């Protein structure tokens, strides 16, 4: 992770020049995760800074409580439990390109550290045996996604969701939700040409994601417990922690990195991290990386 300290003069506006923005994008595409130390105390300036890199925002974040009177800034997942490695919403068409985390308060004892795993490195470390399996066998998720506004009708209605990999899509009036199956591979194209990243929702228990009703491989193939445990152990072997300080901002390439959280001590009631999810960035995918 590369740390960036913005010029103190910038703290009044956080408005970057074209060259400064280009430098941030170049570092982001190279490293995949950036830390802006003590960026600002102003939540308005924070959002204005993020807006310089965002074309649109992910709707999935709406399931979390809103913060600072801004519908784009949300709480992270509630509770004190450990959250296992995952790429945010990688089980659905709502997967954001960039996930931002901002530290309002690091907490009283440092528990609940955010963790991250580089999917590029993890994919590189996997043996050809596993790579062949994941390249040949896509995952199929069975989903039930809540709809924010109340809908009226009876039973279910066939629905059209225009996104590759979506099938069996229905509007469920009784559940006030959209239900569909989503087919997706466990590996992603990265911003670096000809390099793949292992960033997905395979390592997180299903009970952590109420939207996922089922998960399996499309061709009814299975990973045995020994192989699953090996891949999980390998992921955590290269996992790193973020030591939070007040007003730190982390920018994560969600198509490259998986992230999670250590367990929070029950006595640590002051930890406060918020998230913003950029659905589509406003700079070209892989625009600064060379064709190596």
Regions found by a protein language model. Give the residues of each.
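Short secondary-structure capping/junction motifs at helix and strand boundaries
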Residues: 33-34, 57-61, 108-113
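Glycine-rich loop at the start of a catalytic domain that most often binds anionic cofactors/ligands
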Residues: 43-56
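Cytochrome P450 catalytic domain signature, combining two hallmark sequence patches
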Residues: 54-62, 131-133
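Active-site environment of non-heme Fe oxygenases that use a 2-His-1-carboxylate facial triad
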Residues: 1-16, 21-23, 68-72, 79-85, ...
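Glycine-rich nucleotide phosphate-binding loop and flanking beta-alpha elements
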Residues: 42, 91, 258
């Amino acid at each position: 992770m590369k740390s960036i300290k913005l010029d103190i003069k910038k703290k009044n506006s956080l408005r970057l020049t074209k060259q400064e923005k280009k430098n941030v994008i170049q570092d982001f595409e190279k490293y995949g995760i950036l830390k802006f130390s003590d960026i600002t105390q102003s939540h308005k300036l924070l959002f204005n800074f993020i807006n310089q890199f965002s074309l649109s925002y992910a709707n999935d974040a709406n399931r979390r409580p809103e913060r600072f009177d801004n519908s784009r800034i949300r709480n992270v997942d509630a509770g004190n439990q450990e959250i296992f490695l995952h790429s945010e919403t990688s089980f659905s068409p709502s997967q954001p390109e960039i996930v931002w985390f901002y530290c309002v308060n690091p907490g009283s004892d440092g528990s609940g550290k955010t963790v991250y795993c580089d999917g590029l490195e993890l994919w590189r470390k996997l043996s050809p045996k596993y790579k062949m399996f994941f390249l040949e066998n896509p995952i199929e998720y069975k989903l039930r996604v809540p709809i924010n506004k109340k809908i009226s009708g009876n039973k279910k209605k066939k629905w059209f969701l225009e996104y590759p990999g979506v099938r069996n899509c229905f509007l469920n009036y009784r559940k006030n939700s959209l239900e569909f199956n989503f087919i997706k591979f466990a590996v992603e194209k990265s911003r670096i040409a000809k390099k793949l990243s292992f960033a997905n929702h395979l390592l997180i228990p299903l009970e952590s994601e109420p939207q996922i009703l089922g998960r399996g491989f499309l061709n009814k193939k299975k990973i045995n417990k020994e192989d699953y445990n090996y891949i999980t152990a390998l992921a955590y072997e290269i996992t790193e922690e973020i030591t939070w300080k007040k007003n730190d901002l982390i920018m994560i390439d969600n198509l490259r990195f998986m992230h999670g959280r250590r367990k929070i001590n029950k006595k640590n009631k002051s930890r406060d991290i918020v998230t913003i999810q950029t659905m589509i960035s406003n700079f070209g995918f892989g625009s600064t990386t060379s064709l190596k």
